[in-house]
Every structure is written in structure tokens, then in C-alpha cells.
A protein has these predicted regions:
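Short catalytic/ligand-binding loop motif for oxyanion handling, primarily in non-cytosolic enzymes
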Residues: 94-98
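A short alpha/beta connector and helix-capping loop motif
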Residues: 35-37, 52-79, 84-90
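Short, well-ordered beta-to-alpha junction loops that form the rim of enzyme active sites
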Residues: 89-92, 180
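Active-site-adjacent betaalpha module
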Residues: 23-38, 47, 65, 78-82, ...
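Bacterial N-terminal signal peptides that target proteins for export
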Residues: 1-8
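Surface-exposed, active-site-proximal loop segments in enzymatic domains
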Residues: 51-60, 100-103, 193
């Protein structure tokens, strides 16, 4: 039964990854080896995925359209049921991060609206149920003592945290990637992991992005 469940799980993942493929681009596919493959989730936090989060006004429609919250949970659940390793790459800002001498436009915005704010690296004061905290329904999966929570990335990609090191130390060279947001942290993680020699597949309905007057971040991520 366990083997059957594992095969079903891998089939679902492959199907989900393949739901959005441009007709003129080849689909290289991915042979998933459970011994070498991990699920990586970027920013599964309230500020992105909760209606109370500071970005919900621009990401909410995309999250709902893709059933992102539910689909990320399905990834967590399936991974845990099949003993596939899970890594979470979170986004936190501490007080010292607000003292940067120069910032990009989105950094200014994130700091202005208090996105992912924490009191400090060594305290959980005011952390519970804050915008930086995990979405409540994900906590049983993330806080089970098995999920690897990396150090926080500060901008978009894993260049500023220890995700690559943690993956390599676990013998992982294949990554199934999901999380928030599609055209920023998720895409940046994808590109850097590929540059680092990992084989990466993105679950396209387990992510979402901002929709603003200038365009749809999710569509931009899929096209790129």
C-alpha cells in the first residue's frame, strides 16, 4: 500500500508540474528519485497567504484562483505521508534590516508595510500569528521536528541563506519547488538552484503572485 501511495503521489506531482507547458518549448520532465528529491516551499507565511496579511490586497485573487493555500498543503501532506524531505525557506526582517543604507523599490515597500517583521533573530516575541508566522494550517507539517527550516533569505533568492548547503548535506539534487511568490522569491529560488546544479520543477498551482495595474506577476513567472 505504501508503494502504491508513493507512486500515486509522484504521479500527481508530475501531472501538476506539467499542467502549464508552452507548445513550442520542450518539456524535459523529471525522474523523481525519493532518495535524492525534496520539496522546497518558499515563504509559506501569513503576510502572503492569509487574508489578514499585508500583501493580500494584491496577491489574494491569484492565491484564490490557483487554490494555492490548499495545493501547498497537499504537497506538505503527501511529502510527509511518503517520507519525502521538506525544506522551508522563510523570509524574515529584523530591526537591523530596517537600517540598510540603500534598498530597491520592493525592499522599501516591504519595510514600509512591515512585511515579515520580527523582533529579532533570537526571540519569538510577538511572532505567533504575526505576518511572519506560518499559515496556521501548515504548522503541523513545518513544526513536526522533521522539516528543515533554513535561515531566512533577505531579498528573493537563496543566495542569502543556507538552503543550498542544507540540500547538499542531505544528498538532494532534485527539487520540487512551490510557495510564494511566483515571480519573486519562488522564481529566484528556481533560477539560483538551477545555476547551482539542481534539477528543479515548479508546481505551478502551488504558487501565486501580485496582480497590479502594470501586470500579473503569476503570468510573468510562467512565461519566464
Amino acid at each position: 500500500m505504501k508503494i502504491i501511495k508513493k507512486i500515486m503521489f509522484l504521479s500527481i506531482i508530475i501531472t501538476t508540474i506539467s499542467t502549464y507547458v508552452h507548445a513550442d518549448l520542450p518539456n524535459p520532465g523529471m525522474i523523481i528519485d525519493p532518495e535524492r528529491t525534496a520539496i522546497v516551499i518558499t515563504d509559506p507565511q501569513n503576510d502572503f497567504l492569509s487574508p489578514k496579511g499585508v500583501t493580500w490586497g494584491v496577491v489574494g485573487k491569484s492565491v484564490k484562483k490557483n487554490n494555492t493555500v490548499e495545493n501547498i498543503e497537499q504537497l506538505f501532506k503527501a511529502a510527509k505521508e511518503n517520507n519525502l524531505p521538506v525544506f522551508v525557506s522563510p523570509h524574515y526582517y529584523y530591526k537591523h534590516d530596517h537600517k540598510w543604507k540603500f534598498e530597491g523599490a520592493l525592499e522599501v515597500l516591504m519595510h514600509k508595510i512591515g512585511m515579515f517583521n520580527r523582533k529579532g533573530a533570537l526571540t519569538t516575541e510577538d511572532f505567533k500569528d504575526s505576518g511572519a508566522d506560518w499559515l496556521k494550517r501548515y504548522k503541523p507539517y513545518i513544526e513536526d521536528g522533521k522539516t528543515v527550516v533554513t535561515s531566512p533569505h533577505k531579498l528573493y533568492g537563496p543566495e542569502t541563506n543556507d538552503l543550498v548547503l542544507q540540500l547538499r548535506k542531505q544528498g538532494i539534487d532534485k527539487v520540487i519547488l512551490a510557495g510564494m511568490s511566483a515571480n519573486l522569491c519562488t522564481e529566484s529560488h528556481m533560477r539560483e538552484l538551477i545555476e547551482q546544479g539542481f534539477e528543479v520543477a515548479v508546481v505551478t498551482d502551488a504558487t501565486a503572485a501580485a496582480q497590479v495595474l502594470e501586470g500579473d506577476g503569476y503570468e510573468a513567472a510562467v512565461v519566464n
